[in-house]
């Protein structure tokens, strides 16, 4: 009787209104991945190798769906964030490993967001010495007060100017036959730059922080087991939308920049890919989207990181807690923002290289988070009937193995001097 009631309740929720009402956590988490580092990585892929890296996107879309759906399902079933589940399942010592990986990866990405903000505002003539301190202060104030949630949808909307890459791709006139072939035929090269770009693409598409964000967002919405189907729709749609945009960024830059031999070294180079649609306004369009996307992620990352660490070790957390009540939570946020801003302002730093390197770090550390996630999601005692199936487990472990091998290959090729 109880199962029938739950089943009919789930069916009742599967209305258009319910589906749109459930949209948010998965969509926000996936689209937030198209941040400064994401734009830099996808643009570099197209500018450096044309369409040859498109084959990764269908694969990455499936794996993104797997990891994000797993995160959402774990949140619905347990009502807890991933950090809390890691502590309960593995204990404090292994939680230290997971949180260290998350802290390193997220700090690197936050640095890249400030690099993106500095690069974008520089296209408007605002020097980094002015833009970075002011934006860092604004990010800190919004994160500390919790008022960021009031503007996150606006920022997400503005950052969606990158949807223009879809139009720009068609206007640029790519060879669609070549696009179709490269979309399904893998291309592997024994070049450390290519391999590191593959790792960066994985890291920016399936970022560790996105997994924690997706699960926390579901928990914050008080979603339960009856909401799993709705959250799955949200996750799948968000993942597909994010990777479609990523694909068209590669197609656009592969059509406009690659044939001209233009290697992307800064934001101005990347903006040239939008000239087919925006002409002289391409710089303004690109800069607006880059700043909005970077600011969105810069506001999300410190809070996600601090919340996860405090959750893992049982410390007070939340924007509604004062410094006296949650000193570690507020201290971690302040440290991440401060360190990121200072490093970006250091003389002679390559802002574009910062954005790229952060995604490689993401990719290298991703397996650490995925191991914890897949073990938890497959645990009958934690997940019950909603534990991972065989296909989900195989895909996740395969992802872990592939990234680990790619990381080793990347470092070996660099050590041997290939591509030098």
Describe the role of every protein-language-model region.
Residues 29, 56-90, 98-108, 253:
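Juxtamembrane transmembrane-helix boundary signature
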Residues 92-93, 129-134, 237, 241, ...:
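Loop-to-transmembrane helix boundary motifs in multi-pass membrane proteins
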